[in-house]
């Protein structure tokens, strides 16, 4: 295997404080040329998955990583679709307010099939975390003709606290087409087909009875009734689909079709955007998790900044929020006053001690810049981290808070499927 060459150029230390600025938003749709690097962890089916964006298709590598280089990204709505044999399809939506190195974090759910039944008799399955009931003679062919043969059913309970397993970006639209920020309390996926792969559906006026167990640590915030949402794979958003009623530690509802169904807390939403920076204004290159906090507890906590520190996400509307950025083992908070419309927060400075920024270049054995690749960084005191290489260059933040910390950098060239020895 040919070796890649990695050149380390710069090592800096920064300290910072938190400050937030507001700016007037714009409603005009703008397209930016961006880099996209997505990660589908191998334990979430990430190896060899097919990823599509705007008519371009690629595949995840042995670490579940994929890249789209110099692609046009909308300031309003973008959709990435991920498929793999034996897994449920995954869809992620995102947006940007600048040319960015965008990070997409997702996962695939393995199909659990074998719950088949005869449509003439129906089915009643009672599990520990979810249950479903199909009434007899409630299924038809796509043409509307009654279907009474075998139904091949795949069903799955999805942990509402596992953000990589839940499709979309936790945004839904109600019946009036208003956007809402969602927090799942339970998610069920159902998929069915007839003999020989026949397309079948629920008959008009027939429903499936669903119930889902509410996690113990979410019971205190679970209301007596909640909006039921189904996932729209065409738009990448959840859609209002009914009401679920709480019965003890469960939510129960009737639905008219199979698919992804979510029992979600919801707040009317507005777009916020900004940029995380260090004290001197340089970007925070390593993505940090974003928590939206109301009162003393996190309510929405499923976002992440991009590889260049930028973010553009949905947040609860007209509510005082604390935005917590988890980075380097510590939490950095920025308070946000009520946003009744799209808010641009400007630069948010993070208080990061012991931080060092490393920049460098990656070239192949012919001394040509690696156009599409990434750096695998390992250290003796942190998990494995992946950093994008863009036009032969990379930027990384390392949180050196322990004496004796050692980091190794492994450059990977995606286009030529090459990996070098560590530097």
Protein language model annotation of sequence segments:
Residues 48-53, 94, 153, 228, ...:
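Hydrophobic beta-strand segments
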Residues 25-50, 273-287, 359-372:
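Structural motif
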Residues 50-67, 294-316, 380-397:
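Short, acidic Ser/Thr/Gly-rich low-complexity loop/linker segments typical of extracellular
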Residues 13-16:
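C-terminal motif of bacterial Sec signal peptides marking the signal peptidase cleavage site
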Residues 20-27, 63, 103-125, 178-183, ...:
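Proteolytic cleavage junctions
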Residues 18-128, 141-145, 160, 164, ...:
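Acidic/polar, low-complexity intrinsically disordered N-terminal segments immediately downstream
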Residues 130-207:
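Long, contiguous ectodomains of secretory-pathway proteins
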